[in-house]
Amino acid sequence: MTASYLPSIFVPLVGLVFPAITMASLFIYIEQDEIV
């Protein structure tokens, strides 16, 4: 049982999920800042 396939899963996952969370949190922060 080798873990050689893990980088091919984690690299796109980190490259897509982290920017998505960052953009979503920034969008929510800006929206809340405009409402208040």
Swiss-Prot record:
NCBIfam families: PRK11877.1, PS_I_psaI. It comes from the Eukaryota. It is found in: Plastid, Chloroplast thylakoid membrane. PANTHER family: PHOTOSYSTEM I REACTION CENTER SUBUNIT VIII (PTHR35775:SF2), PTHR35775. SUPFAM superfamilies: Subunit VIII of photosystem I reaction centre, PsaI. Keywords: Chloroplast, Membrane, Photosynthesis, Photosystem I, Plastid, Thylakoid, Transmembrane, Transmembrane helix. One of its GO terms (biological process) is photosynthesis. The chain crosses the membrane at residues 7-29. It is a single-pass membrane protein. Disulfide bonds: none annotated. Its main location: plastid. GO terms for cellular component: chloroplast thylakoid membrane; photosystem I. The keyword Membrane applies. This is Photosystem I reaction center subunit VIII. May help in the organization of the PsaL subunit. Belongs to the PsaI family. The keyword Thylakoid applies.
